[in-house]
Amino acid sequence: MQHNQLLEQLYSGHSLSTSESTALFNAVIQGELSNEQIAAMLIALKVRGANTEEITGAVAASLQNAKVFPRPDYPFADIVGTGGDGQNTINISTASAIVAASMGAKVAKHGNRSVSSKSGASDVLTALGVNVNVTLEQARQALDEIGVCFLFAQQYHSGFRHVAPVRAALKTHTIFNILGPLINPARPTYHLLGVYAPELVKTYAETAVALEHQHSFVVHGSGLDEVALHGETQVAEIKNGKIEYFTLTPEDFGLKTQSLESLRGGEPQENTQYLTALLQGKGKAEHANAVAANTALLLKLFGYDDLKQNVQNVLAHLVSGKAFETLQKLTTY
């Protein structure tokens, strides 16, 4: 009966503690709630707005029930956005992960099929020839050997299948849209997390503290769940339990403002062509700049503090074609 009491608590507008949220989401992930109960719970949370404790509990339950990834002892990062910003851009964080890895960083990218865009991380990687359904061991091997691996959310969080039909029927943002970036089964040392709404920056930052993230950035870039070059980027930096909020502009990266329109993507096949050209050093300048800015902030987590220098290094590195070599290696796993 405990589930019913917790559900009743939500229906009456009351918040759940972290442990209560963990218990309720455990029940969801283990298939103990009906579709109707899941739908009611998701809407109750949406109408009131899930708080830090509730999100932290949902993350805890998700990780407790996920397949266990053999976590390496070296530092590694994830760069991932919530999706759902509705902007249909090229796959900036996917490209940034590959570029950073080709420059010596280690990145275990967590991702899924498209939420709202035409082409999610796994859609475009599949189109590029990457096997997104590799085993845990193969993913870990790729991370060790070439510095990057892709962890396909559906493979690691099989309990989410109980929620899938409800989410599809509701056709609206729910708490599950904001869980994705926080539930990487490899539990990375560092995170660059993009959120689709500015008000989520604070919520996410506080959740990252509750989850004891070592060093993370949460970003919202003028309507994008990435660092923006068409406007300002709101940033929360989480380090050793402390949060610092600040704003980044294109000038902070040594770049000029460019239009959001210049980053529009399309179907996976079209995005694949853009990304292939970019990683070969033959892409559009606007694409290269956007990936350079996001990779620059990602590299800051690894101790490369000068964003302008990072951008210059990334742009020079792209021309070498080494990032494309890393992608080609990734397709062999």
From Swiss-Prot:
User: Which residues does the record give as anthranilate 1 binding sites?
Assistant: 81, 112
Q: Which GO molecular function entries does the Swiss-Prot or TrEMBL record give?
A: anthranilate phosphoribosyltransferase activity; magnesium ion binding
The protein's superkingdom reads: Bacteria
Which positions form S-S bridges? none
Amino acids binding Mg(2+) 1: 93, 226
* Catalysis performed (reactions): N-(5-phospho-beta-D-ribosyl)anthranilate + diphosphate = 5-phospho-alpha-D-ribose 1-diphosphate + anthranilate
This protein's pathway: Amino-acid biosynthesis; L-tryptophan biosynthesis; L-tryptophan from chorismate: step 2/5
Q: Where does anthranilate 2 bind?
A: 167
- List the EC numbers from the record: 2.4.2.18
This molecule's function is given as:
Catalyzes the transfer of the phosphoribosyl group of 5-phosphorylribose-1-pyrophosphate (PRPP) to anthranilate to yield N-(5'-phosphoribosyl)-anthranilate (PRA).
> In which family does this protein belong, per the annotation?
Belongs to the anthranilate phosphoribosyltransferase family.
Protein name as it appears in the record:
Anthranilate phosphoribosyltransferase
Q: Which organism is it from?
A: Haemophilus influenzae (strain PittEE)
- Record gene name: trpD
